[in-house]
Amino acid sequence: MNTHSKSLVAGFGLLLVLTAPVFGQGDPRTDPKAVKKVVATVDQDGVQRVAIVGGGYFYDPNYVVVKANVPVELSVTKEAGMTPHDFAIKAPEAGIDVAIKSLDTKPQVVKFTPTKAGKYPFICTKKMVFMQSHKDKGMQGVLEVTE
């Protein structure tokens, strides 16, 4: 490889590295490794509200931060489509036991008050026979409870 070709390859590599933060931030809708974080704020009525959309093996946002001992309302919907999805967070030790058996395009609201700081996974529990689970395909996220 001559010097000019090496320079072109190096330049292209540098371009990819520099543009990755702009174009490669990732969207959980298209990149299962992308993280979209939302920090809930407490409304005037003292409730933390977050809207989550589920779809083609993603949740958006897929990282939600809430405060302990403050009521939470999650409004969970599904993008239009044929594939069934659900939503589950199981952490009874922290006051969290959420299960929406079938997501819909109309919002379904779940209410709970987390009592213990920690990171708790939320997942789609659906799995077709002989296929990866929806969780394994990227339909998972984290509910982080802070003090």
Name the predicted role of every residue range.
Residues 61-64, 96-101, 110-111:
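Beta-strand-rich interaction surfaces with strong enrichment in secreted/lumenal proteins
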Residues 77-104, 131-139:
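Histidine- and aromatic-enriched segments that form or immediately flank copper-ligand environments
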Residues 41-69:
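N-terminal edge beta-strand
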Residues 33-37, 102-147:
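Extracellular/periplasmic metallocenter environments
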Residues 51-53, 73-75, 88, 123, ...:
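Soluble periplasmic/extracytoplasmic beta-strand elements of cell-envelope proteins
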Residues 71, 82-86, 119:
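Exposed beta-strand and adjacent loop surfaces of beta-rich binding modules
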Residues 2-51, 147:
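Extracytoplasmic entry segments of secretory-pathway proteins
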Residues 54-56, 76-80, 114:
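Non-cytosolic beta-sheet module surface loops
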